[in-house]
């Protein structure tokens, strides 16, 4: 299988998000990389489904709460930026203050 660098990045995000999803389901608090992967994967999937950039920017703030992550993670994670592929092309989605 030959993947472009962007496809490899998406695969890495998905794999990390899968680990984060499983840990969250078991009641474990997510660390910084897991939280970023969890939010990023949800944004990528939403773009694939055809949701708008504005919708995804808002959606990204609803995925995790302070109770879902380790202490200090909300303060470290001030924004998440994901280059997502939409039906009409690739766009940058920025989620400001994703953990509230």
From Swiss-Prot:
Q: Which GO terms describe its cellular component?
A: cytoplasm
Q: What SUPFAM superfamilies is this protein classified in?
A: Urease, gamma-subunit
* Pfam families cross-referenced by the UniProt entry: Urease_gamma
Subcellular localization(s) per the UniProt record: Cytoplasm
Q: Which reaction does it catalyse?
A: urea + 2 H2O + H(+) = hydrogencarbonate + 2 NH4(+)
Which of UniProt's keywords are assigned here?
A: Cytoplasm, Hydrolase
Pathway per the UniProt entry: Nitrogen metabolism; urea degradation; CO(2) and NH(3) from urea (urease route): step 1/1
Q: What is its main location?
A: cytoplasm
Q: Which domain of life is it from?
A: Bacteria
Question: Which top EC class is given?
Answer: hydrolase
Biological processes per GO annotation: urea catabolic process
Q: Could you give the subunit structure recorded for this chain?
A: Heterotrimer of UreA (gamma), UreB (beta) and UreC (alpha) subunits. Three heterotrimers associate to form the active enzyme.
- Sequence similarity: Belongs to the urease gamma subunit family.
Name used for this protein in its record = Urease subunit gamma
């Amino acid at each position: 299988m030959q993947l472009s660098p962007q496809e490899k990045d998406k695969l890495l995000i998905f794999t990390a998000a899968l680990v984060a999803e499983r840990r969250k389901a078991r009641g474990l608090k997510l660390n910084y990389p897991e939280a970023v992967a969890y939010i990023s994967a949800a944004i990528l999937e939403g773009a694939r489904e055809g949701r708008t950039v504005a919708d995804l920017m808002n959606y990204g703030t609803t995925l995790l709460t302070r109770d879902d992550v380790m202490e200090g993670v909300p303060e470290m994670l001030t924004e998440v930026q994901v280059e997502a592929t939409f039906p009409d092309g690739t766009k940058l989605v920025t989620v400001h203050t994703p953990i509230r």
